[in-house]
Structures are given as C-alpha cells and as structure tokens.
C-alpha cells in the first residue's frame, strides 16, 4: 500500500473509530468513507491495468480492494440505514485475507513491520466481524478505540514516515508497533467504554429495542 493512500486510510480509521465511540454521527463520517473507499478501489484498478501482468504489482494492488470495499460499504450503510450484518461477514473475509498478506510480508518481502501491521488489521477486522456479523453490540466502544489506535500506529504514522523518506522496516519498528498495537487491543474494552459517548454506553430504551429486533 502506497504511503499516500495509507495516510488517508489512517484518517478514515480514526473517523470511523470516533463514529463507533459515538463522537461522530454515521452521516458525518460518510463523506470520508466515500472518498477513501473510492481511492482504494480506483488506485489498485489503475495499478493492475498498468502492471503488464507483473505478478508482484498485482499482488500488492489486490489487498487495497479489501479496504476500499469496506469503506464504501460503511458509507453506503450510513446513507441507506442498511444493517451491518453483510459488512460484518465480509470483515471476517478481510481478517482471514489479512493473515495471508501478513505471512507474505514476513516471508516473501522480509518486511516485519508491515507483517505486524497486517496482523493488527486482521485483529481489527475480526473485531468488526464480532460486532457487525455476530451482533455483539457491547464491543462497539472497544472496536472504536482499536480503530482509532490503529489509524494512528498502523497507518497515519507509518504513511507519514514513508512519504517523508524516513520509514525503515526491521525488528525494532515491528516490535514497537506490535507492543503498542496489541496493548491497545488488550485494553480496548475498558478504555473504549471510558472514551465513548454516554449514548453508546448507556443507550436509551428505544435504542436498545432497535438493536434487539
């Protein structure tokens, strides 16, 4: 994933995390999901069309669709009020695919930092599956906090370092990202509930009834 695209992935993860925390309305988060989702679909399509059949280029571009489709789906759900069950099950597909991309980063690319980043994305998208696909609504604040944290440590910061020419992969960056990222996952539930808006942690009776229908 190129540095420019990754930078805006960081932005949309932060915005969507704040949405899950109840700090931004779904409609307020929609435009950026359309922008970044469109970017993450158009960019790999152009790369593949210009690849001349280069397998490495095609493989690198293929993972972008996982995120592009996710953000476009979020945007469409937000403006149509469709339920998130389908997106939740797609998130399980993304989580499993991310494990494969992580393995490829560790082995074929000798890039442990992005190997860890892909692992953290797998965890986040699996949490989205639990939240949306299986309906574990109580996880909403936890998923929101992890999305914000990963937006910073797996996307925005690495992307800024990449585009500024200061990015270095290796065991040390991988270890730093892993420690911060997995600590965020472990602490997600209590911190998420502390950061969430009252309407998320203590929904009114009408909202509770809506989630159980």
UniProtKB/Swiss-Prot annotation:
GO CC term (a single one): plasma membrane
Source taxon at top rank: Bacteria
Protein family according to the UniProt entry: Belongs to the AmiS/UreI family.
Positions of transmembrane segments: 4-20, 32-48, 56-72, 116-132, 146-162, 172-188
Described function: Possible transporter that might be responsible for the adsorption of amidase substrates or release of their hydrolysis products.
Protein's UniProt name: Putative amidate substrates transporter protein
Subcellular location: Cell membrane
The keyword Transcription belongs to this UniProt entry's keyword annotation: no
CDD domains: UreI_AmiS_like_2 (cd13429)
A Pfam cross-reference name: AmiS_UreI
Membrane protein topology class: Multi-pass membrane protein
Alphabetic keyword roster: Cell membrane, Membrane, Transmembrane, Transmembrane helix, Transport
């Amino acid at each position: 994933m190129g540095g420019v695209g990754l930078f805006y992935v960081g932005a949309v993860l932060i915005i969507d995390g704040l949405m899950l925390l109840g700090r931004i309305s779904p409609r307020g988060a929609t435009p950026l999901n359309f922008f970044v989702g469109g970017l993450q679909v158009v960019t790999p399509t152009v790369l593949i069309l210009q690849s001349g059949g280069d397998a490495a280029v095609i493989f690198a571009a293929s993972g972008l669709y996982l995120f592009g489709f996710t953000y476009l789906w979020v945007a469409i759900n937000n403006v149509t009020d469709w339920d998130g069950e389908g997106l939740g099950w797609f998130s399980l597909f993304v989580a499993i695919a991310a494990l494969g991309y992580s393995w490829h980063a560790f082995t074929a690319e000798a890039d442990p930092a992005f190997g860890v980043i892909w692992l953290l994305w797998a965890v986040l998208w699996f949490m989205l599956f639990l939240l949306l696909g299986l309906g574990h609504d109580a996880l909403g604040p936890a998923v929101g906090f992890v999305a914000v944290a990963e937006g910073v440590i797996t996307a925005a910061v690495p992307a800024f370092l990449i585009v500024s020419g200061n990015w270095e992969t290796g065991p040390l960056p991988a270890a730093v990202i892993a420690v911060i990222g997995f600590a965020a996952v472990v602490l997600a539930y209590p911190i998420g509930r502390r950061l969430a808006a009252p309407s998320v942690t203590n929904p009114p009776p009408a909202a509770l009834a809506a989630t159980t229908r």
